[in-house]
């Protein structure tokens, strides 16, 4: 530890820390443009100049290491004059675009010019102008505003792992851009907008829409993948206008995937805003009593074993426990939440959660990916794996379809046969201090999925990934609702049917709770389908009765991420038209048939959640534990010999919100369609 004095305050920081970090530890605010806590140090903006005793001139605090006994001054006349000079140089070529710039009101350059700049300009020469660059459908460029901080270059190379941005030329001719003019091929490109300190990189789909001070901010949880990234939903009136990441070191740090950030325009398209009932083969608008009456009329003649329910990928825990209680009251054990057919058992949590936790990735000594492409399934988690590799040696092996993960990985095979023949990588896995195995949904689909899960667990035991201090067995989900549903036991009860068993006439009444990710053509022609959800998607097209529900931004909901971390979102906007929160719809229907569910408000529903599974009583907290019980999950059928499939064939089209989004459709045309054409 190094001891130094900052503006008369004694500070102790680790050896190797920068002077800027020491100043922050002393509570001093140091202006900066190029420095970012999660990127390498560039030291090229010079805005963070401070005075160090016995130094001949001001030094850049972000790039200067501390030394024992150092005396630092952050607010002397020399420092103020130096910062004023730097700001004057930065503004020489910067246009006066503040009144029309989308960054206005949240611009670092604006704020620091006010605090450290001059009240007039002495520059009377011509300003330079730079041609705007094309970076794809999500990031808009105004390169004349660029101050060459190089944050975007470092983010692309270090965090996203796609080194497509760089600087060309030198001096006043220097420009930032892509070496070849094409769209950025990263699922994290929206983060460039957040880290840009000026208005050079902006939100293209939402440009010139609103000022930041006009927006109402609501904390929430993302549902577009299973990581549960913490987000801020910014709305005005009844419309969501943007979604930004919230910092959570244990989940998403401060990053957010492009789908989570930009798909919100799908929240206002193809919405279900009133009940519908199919009459003579055609869906007709109806009232709530008429819709409930149509369902009740069908229920009267049915025994419990002819009723089934399927929960979708975006459901909150409150609606799932209400539907489970409703079906139980009707005498049915036909439940399923695994639309993709993944062989995941409910019960012991270690068999279906990411046990090492997301921060635990940084402690892994070696990583084996089985049937998963984390770049497509969870880009922010993939960035965490890349971060681990940037910290030091960590061999990575993959079993499944070959893919560019943005980091070096040994491809060991395409299917389950490779689990028994890891070769040299197996030796690396056994030699690693804390080996990690990540199993994806593509490996668990199909009749051999249970055997793959059991084999992966046995492999974890064999390589030493399961110890009292470390649990290196992890399941990476693709659905935000999946872990919560398994925690609630939303799977077939004794004698119950799974999704496959409910298809083809296996039940006479099927309740789809926002379930759109399976082939509805498999449903029996005579099966009466109730679809409860928020978008007119696949499930609604097959429905006999449609009950309009609320999207994730329109209700307070509890979600459990792939780690098993319980998180909660809050209401940002109101549902459109006659749509209502899903648990309330189920409660109202139960009352209409004389079997009222035992809760009247959201607090009572959450008490019921904690009663069903105590994990719902605790939010955010997640204790990482080792594994003391080495007995594995049931093996089921034998493993197949075919290759694993792909869990997410199109990153931008994974749920009804994305499929309704014009922005996501443009991304598919830009990124996915050319790849599919090339493959053909």
For the regions a language model picked out, list residue spans one by one:
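N-terminal export/assembly segments and adjacent metallocofactor-ligating motifs
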Residues: 1-16, 24, 36, 51-55, ...
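Long, low-complexity segments enriched in small/aliphatic residues
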Residues: 604-680
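Non-catalytic alpha/beta scaffold blocks inside enzyme catalytic domains
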Residues: 335, 339-620, 671, 675-680
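Generic alpha-helical structural context detector
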Residues: 21-24, 88, 194, 328, ...
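Short, glycine-/polar-rich solvent-exposed loops and beta-turns at beta-strand/coil boundaries
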Residues: 35-44, 64-65, 170, 604
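A basic, amphipathic helix-loop patch mediating RNA/tRNA/ribosome contacts
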Residues: 19-53
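A cross-taxa feature marking solvent-exposed loop/turn segments within ectodomains of secreted
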Residues: 55-57, 466
């Amino acid at each position: 530890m190094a001891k130094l004095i900052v503006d008369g305050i004694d500070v102790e920081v680790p050896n190797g820390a920068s002077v800027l970090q020491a100043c922050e530890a002393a509570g001093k605010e140091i202006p900066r443009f190029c420095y970012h806590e999660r990127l390498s140090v560039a030291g090229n903006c010079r805005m963070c100049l401070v005075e160090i005793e016995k130094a001949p001139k001001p030094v850049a605090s972000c790039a200067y290491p501390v030394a024992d006994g150092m005396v630092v001054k952050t607010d002397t006349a020399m420092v103020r004059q130096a910062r004023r000079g730097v700001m004057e140089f930065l503004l020489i070529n910067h246009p006066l675009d503040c009144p029309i710039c989308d960054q206005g009101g949240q611009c670092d350059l604006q704020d620091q010019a006010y605090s450290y700049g001059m009240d007039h300009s002495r520059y009377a020469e011509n300003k330079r102008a730079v041609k705007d660059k094309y970076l794809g459908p999500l990031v808009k460029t105004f390169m004349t505003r660029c101050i060459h901080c190089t944050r975007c270059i470092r983010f692309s190379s270090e965090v996203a792992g796609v080194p497509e941005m760089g600087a060309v030329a030198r001096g006043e001719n220097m420009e930032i851009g892509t070496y070849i003019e094409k769209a950025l091929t990263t699922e994290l490109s929206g983060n460039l907008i957040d880290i840009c300190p000026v208005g050079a990189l902006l939100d293209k789909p939402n440009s010139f829409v609103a000022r930041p001070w006009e927006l109402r901010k609501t904390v929430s949880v993302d549902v577009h993948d299973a990581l549960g990234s913490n987000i801020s939903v910014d709305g005005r009136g009844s419309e969501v206008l943007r979604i930004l990441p919230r910092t959570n070191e244990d989940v998403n740090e401060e990053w957010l995937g492009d789908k989570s950030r930009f798909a919100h325009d799908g929240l206002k398209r193809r919405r279900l805003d009133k009940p519908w009932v199919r009459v003579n083969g055609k869906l007709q608008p109806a009232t709530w009593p008429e819709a409930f009456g149509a369902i009740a009329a069908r229920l009267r003649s049915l025994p419990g074993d002819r009723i089934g329910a399927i929960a979708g990928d975006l459901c909150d825990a409150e609606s799932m426990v209400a539907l489970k209680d409703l079906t139980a009251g009707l005498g049915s054990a036909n439940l399923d939440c695994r639309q993709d057919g993944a062989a995941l058992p409910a019960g012991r949590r270690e068999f279906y959660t990411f046990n090492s936790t997301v921060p635990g990735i940084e402690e892994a000594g070696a990583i084996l990916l089985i049937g998963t492409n984390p770049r497509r399934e969870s880009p922010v988690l993939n960035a965490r794996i890349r971060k681990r590799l940037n910290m030091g040696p960590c061999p990575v092996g993959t079993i499944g379809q070959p893919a560019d993960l943005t980091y070096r990985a040994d491809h060991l095979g395409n299917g389950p046969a490779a689990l028994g023949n890891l070769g040299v990588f197996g030796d690396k896995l056994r030699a690693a201090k804390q080996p990690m195995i990540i199993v994806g949904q593509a490996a668990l689909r199909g009749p051999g999925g249970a055997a793959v899960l059991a084999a992966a667990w046995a492999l974890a035991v064999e390589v030493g990934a399961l110890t009292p201090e470390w649990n290196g067995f992890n399941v990476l989900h693709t659905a935000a609702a999946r872990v919560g549903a398994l925690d609630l036991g939303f799977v077939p009860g004794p004698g119950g049917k799974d999704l496959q068993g409910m298809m083809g006439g296996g039940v006479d009444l099927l309740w789809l709770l926002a379930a759109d990710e399976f082939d509805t053509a498999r449903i029996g022609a005579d099966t009466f389908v109730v679809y409860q959800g928020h978008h007119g998607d696949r499930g609604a097209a097959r429905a006999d009765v449609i009950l309009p529900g609320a999207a994730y931004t329109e209700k307070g909901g509890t979600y459990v991420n792939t780690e098993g971390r319980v998180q909660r979102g809050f209401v940002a906007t109101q549902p459109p038209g006659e749509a209502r929160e899903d648990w309330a719809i189920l409660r109202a229907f139960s009352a209409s048939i004389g079997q009222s569910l035992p809760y009247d408000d959201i607090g009572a529903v959450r008490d019921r959640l904690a009663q069903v599974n105590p994990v719902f009583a605790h939010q955010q907290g997640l204790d990482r534990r080792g594994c003391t019980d080495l007995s594995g999950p049931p093996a089921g059928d034998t493993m197949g010999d075919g290759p694993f499939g792909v869990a997410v064939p199109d990153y931008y089209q994974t749920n009804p919100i994305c499929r309704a989004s014009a922005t996501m459709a443009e991304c598919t045309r830009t990124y996915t369609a050319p790849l599919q054409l090339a493959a053909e």
